């Protein structure tokens, strides 16, 4: 006699009930040959369902041995048991256990997805099985659109999808009317005639009599095992290929991609089924990611705005001033900064441009209009040194400086104050105190955080200011613009050394504007980091919310998880499905968060009329994607792991 296809040896199944241990199965010995049709019959509580769960590798014996096709199951891990269910067993449940969000064909295809069957053959086989079972017009129907008998036919087709060498039918007629139940039994007998091994679990002896062998179970023990050789045979189901599914050996990569696409599809269906909950969960991610990206963009925009203002005062410049420091009371009495120092500094290789500076206040008059303004005596290179741009006319040249020319360049505020908006100031003569000067240029307005934006400024040659207005020879300061190839610190040291050589004493100090830039960058970086950390904390809170929602989802979909495990899903497949769902929620939220942040940037720009721009970087957006992905993985892992470790028997029993 050939080796049994199924063999149980002295199997016990015990459960803990408080401090006691309850034996549900006792000393069960059973062997079933390939091609048999066996009915296991017993009253409710007799242990027949527990026996079926052990036969289908959904549960394990507490003691004893169980072999399937010669393979001992005792030491198999959960994934090896899943392989047995996938490759050998097909389940037909009393309550059908079809997934409500999938079509009839998709429900039938599910075991083949986990078996790694290619999509083309998978679609063809599922459709062929449904057609043979009389459902050719119902391939795309959802379970809710099918009658009970049609749903059970879909369940039978699903059991046959991977070949269904052993079909376990648990009360297959229990939820059906008599006529439909008889039709299901006829199909099972035809499948048995085609070579499938059928194990029929029922409490109804009239149903059990359709089998060739009836095993009675009571109080966890087999009390009767009778063969019925007189049972009438039936022809095989027309067109059935027999127990083995005709599929090529699966390619690991393709099989993994197919399972991934199935997980993605189920994630999308689950999200769509709970749209409000998904949107509320996603809203937290959207706000968190938008906050992170916006904070970084605000920090970068603020930093750039301040640096632009520093540039307006002079980009990469070093100022030489009398005294020891700002506010030195003796600075006014030091008169050693002179024009010769300017010429010496201008000859240095690190000097891009140099301008002396003296400043005073004076009354500015044009005809009958008088205003108070600041008069600055500077050199011809002043626009280059300070980044001043001319809107109209020109700046005075070296010749005007040499001849102490009475030329003046005015700012836009002075133009408005003296000439209004209708008179062209170029060529007009104004009085600076008692000194007449011809207007040769108007500077562009400068938006700056530093200084008074409403102040009036005019610029004249420093030689003119010294001789005609101030009546002195010494300068208030000298500003050197350092060329781009020289580090500011090196230029500062070289200027200090040169001035010490010229003056013979430290009667001056230098101020490097690069110090302001470095301070601004450090400050903005610190503030950006601080606010970003607050945003990250909010993302962690959002992540906990995602984990909570996913745990709720696992609880709601426990039965679905049990069905997937019954048809052969590995633990990794279940974990992958829920991880993908969590990551998908977070990724979509991340994308929408970035779009929200970009929209905020547009609104800020419009609200400030372009005066302030949020600066976005690809790095911050990539970081946002990484953050949203990590949130999905980190906070989706625990729910996914919880789902993967569910017991298939308990999951199937959950309503």
Swiss-Prot record:
Transmembrane intervals: 280-300, 527-547, 583-603, 620-640
Protein name: Macrolide export ATP-binding/permease protein MacB
Family from the record: Belongs to the ABC transporter superfamily. Macrolide exporter (TC 3.A.1.122) family.
Gene Ontology terms: cellular component: plasma membrane
An example molecular function term from Gene Ontology annotations: ATP hydrolysis activity
Pfam families registered for this protein in UniProt: ABC_tran, FtsX, MacB_PCD
Main location: membrane
Location of the ABC transporter domain: 6-244
Binding residue positions for ATP: 42-49
Record's keyword terms, sorted: Antibiotic resistance, ATP-binding, Cell inner membrane, Cell membrane, Membrane, Nucleotide-binding, Translocase, Transmembrane, Transmembrane helix, Transport
Quaternary structure and partners: Homodimer.
Membrane topology type: Multi-pass membrane protein
EC numbers for this chain: 7.6.2.-
InterPro entries on file: AAA+_ATPase, ABC3_permease_C, ABC_transporter-like_ATP-bd, ABC_transporter-like_CS, MacB-like_ATP-bd, MacB_PCD, Macrolide_Exporter_MacB, P-loop_NTPase
Gene Ontology annotations of biological process type: response to antibiotic
Biological role: Non-canonical ABC transporter that contains transmembrane domains (TMD), which form a pore in the inner membrane, and an ATP-binding domain (NBD), which is responsible for energy generation. Confers resistance against macrolides.
Cell location: Cell inner membrane
Enzyme class: translocase
Matching SUPFAM superfamilies: P-loop containing nucleoside triphosphate hydrolases
Residues covered by region (Disordered): 225-252
């Amino acid at each position: 006699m050939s080796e049994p296809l199924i063999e149980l040896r002295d199997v016990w199944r015990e459960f803990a009930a408080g401090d006691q241990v309850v034996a549900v199965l006792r000393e069960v010995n059973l062997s079933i040959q390939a091609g048999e049709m066996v009915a296991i019959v017993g009253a409710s509580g007799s242990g027949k369902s527990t026996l079926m769960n052990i036969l289908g590798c959904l549960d394990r014996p507490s003691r004893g041995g169980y072999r399937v096709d010669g393979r001992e199951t005792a030491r198999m891990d959960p994934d090896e048991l899943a392989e047995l269910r996938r490759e050998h067993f097909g389940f037909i449940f009393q309550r059908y256990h079809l997934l409500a969000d999938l079509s009839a064909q998709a429900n039938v295809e599910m075991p083949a997805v986990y078996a790694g069957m290619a999509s083309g053959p998978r679609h063809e086989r599922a459709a062929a099985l449904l057609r043979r079972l009389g459902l050719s017009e119902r391939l795309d129907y959802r379970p809710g659109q099918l009658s009970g008998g049609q749903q059970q036919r879909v369940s039978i087709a699903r059991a046959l999808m991977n070949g269904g060498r052993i079909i376990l039918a648990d009360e297959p007629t229990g939820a059906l009317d008599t006529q439909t139940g008889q039709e299901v039994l006829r199909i099972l007998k035809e499948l048995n005639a085609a070579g499938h091994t059928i194990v029929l679990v029922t409490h109804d002896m009239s149903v059990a009599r359709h089998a060739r062998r009836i095993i009675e179970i009571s109080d966890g023990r087999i009390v009767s095992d009778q063969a019925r050789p007189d049972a009438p045979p039936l022809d095989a189901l027309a067109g059935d290929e027999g127990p083995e599914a005709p599929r090529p050996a699966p390619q690991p990569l393709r099989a993994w991609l197919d399972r991934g696409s199935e997980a993605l599809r189920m994630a999308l269906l689950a999200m769509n089924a709970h749209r409000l909950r998904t949107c509320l969960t996603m809203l937290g991610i959207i706000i968190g990611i938008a906050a992170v990206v916006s904070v970084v963009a605000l920090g970068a925009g603020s930093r750039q705005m301040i640096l632009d203002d520093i540039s307006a005062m002079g980009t990469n410049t070093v100022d030489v001033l009398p005294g020891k420091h700002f506010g030195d009371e003796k600075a006014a009495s030091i008169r050693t900064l002179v024009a010769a120092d300017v010429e010496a500094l201008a000859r240095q290789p690190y000097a891009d441009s140099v301008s002396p500076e003296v400043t005073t206040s004076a009354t500015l008059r044009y005809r009958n209009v008088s205003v108070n303004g600041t008069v600055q005596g500077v050199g011809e290179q002043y626009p280059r040194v300070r980044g001043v741009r001319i809107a109209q006319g020109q700046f005075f040249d070296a010749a005007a400086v040499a001849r102490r020319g009475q030329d003046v360049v005015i700012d836009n505020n002075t133009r408005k104050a003296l000439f209004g908006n209708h008179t062209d100031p170029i060529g007009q003569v104004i009085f600076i105190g008692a000194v007449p000067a011809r207007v040769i240029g108007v500077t562009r307005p400068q938006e700056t955080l530093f200084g008074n934006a409403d102040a009036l400024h005019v610029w004249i040659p420093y030689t003119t200011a010294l001789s005609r207005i101030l009546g002195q020879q010494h300068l208030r300061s000298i500003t050197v613009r350092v060329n781009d190839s020289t580090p500011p610190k090196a230029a500062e040291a070289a200027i200090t050394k040169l001035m010490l050589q010229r003056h013979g004493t430290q009667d001056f100090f230098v101020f490097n504007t690069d110090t302001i830039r470095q301070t601004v960058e450090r400050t903005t970086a610190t503030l950006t980091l601080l606010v970003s950390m607050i945003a990250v904390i909010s993302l962690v809170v959002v992540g906990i919310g995602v984990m909570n929602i996913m745990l709720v989802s696992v609880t709601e979909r426990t039965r679905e998880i049990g069905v997937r495990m019954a048809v052969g899903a590995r633990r990794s497949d279940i974990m992958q499905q829920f991880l993908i769902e969590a990551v998908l929620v977070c990724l979509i939220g991340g994308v929408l968060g970035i779009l929200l942040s970009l929209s905020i940037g547009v609104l800020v720009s419009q609200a400030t009329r372009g005066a302030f721009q949020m600066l976005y970087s690809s790095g911050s957006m990539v970081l946002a994607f990484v953050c949203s992905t990590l949130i999905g993985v980190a906070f989706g892992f625990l729910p996914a792991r919880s789902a993967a470790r569910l017991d298939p028997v308990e999951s199937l029993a959950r309503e």
